[in-house]
Design a protein with these regions (language model features):
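GHKL-family ATP-binding catalytic core of two-component histidine kinases
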Residues: 1, 21-23, 98, 133
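Alpha-helix capping/helix-boundary segments
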Residues: 79, 100-102, 132
Length: 165
């Protein structure tokens, strides 16, 4: 029987929250799926603003990057006031966040417009963990001039199950 690598608590959107055991194979398969979806390579650098106790931060930002041999810069959490300056400093090729974070990023952009436009290496942005409004997706893509990948997942599936290019 496979050993449990991590136990996660589901969000409980369809029933009461429950403990979900994830095996090493679950986590590796999910990381590889995300790596393939995003076409990550060793040249990529992820700026991780998601907490590592959340499957989004652990699976998508950290493990998918490591599966590609890419680098990850963990910011210590999301800070809307510092996001654009961190983006300019870290110079990632991608980042992943939840829609509420993307909204803060868009809302702060007029105040941080110089920093928002100083990352020529940014090649994609990922959103997951909640529904993304089409308008917000468009606003983020216009702000950064790169495509946004909208992913869908669930804790029980080790995170990402599908993604829109």
């Amino acid at each position: 029987m496979p050993t449990c690598a991590r136990r996660r608590t589901s969000s409980g959107t369809t029933a009461r929250p429950k403990q979900v055991p994830l095996t090493h194979a679950n986590l590796c398969a999910s990381a590889d799926n995300i790596r393939k979806t995003l076409q990550l390579t060793p040249e990529d650098r992820c700026m991780n603003v998601m907490p590592l106790f959340h499957i989004h931060g652990l699976g998508a930002a950290l493990l998918a990057s490591l599966a590609a041999g890419a680098s990850v810069v963990c910011t210590g959490g999301f800070d809307g006031l510092r996001f654009h300056s961190l983006l300019a400093k870290v110079q990632p090729t991608w980042y992943t966040a939840v829609p509420t974070m993307h909204q803060v990023i868009v809302d702060r952009a007029p105040r941080d417009i110089d920093a928002a436009r100083t990352n020529p290496g940014l090649r994609l942005i990922r959103s997951c963990s909640a529904a993304l409004a089409p308008r917000l997706m468009s606003d983020v893509e216009k702000l950064f001039g790169v495509p946004m990948v909208e992913a869908y997942g669930m804790t029980e599936a080790s995170h990402q199950m599908a993604a829109n290019p």
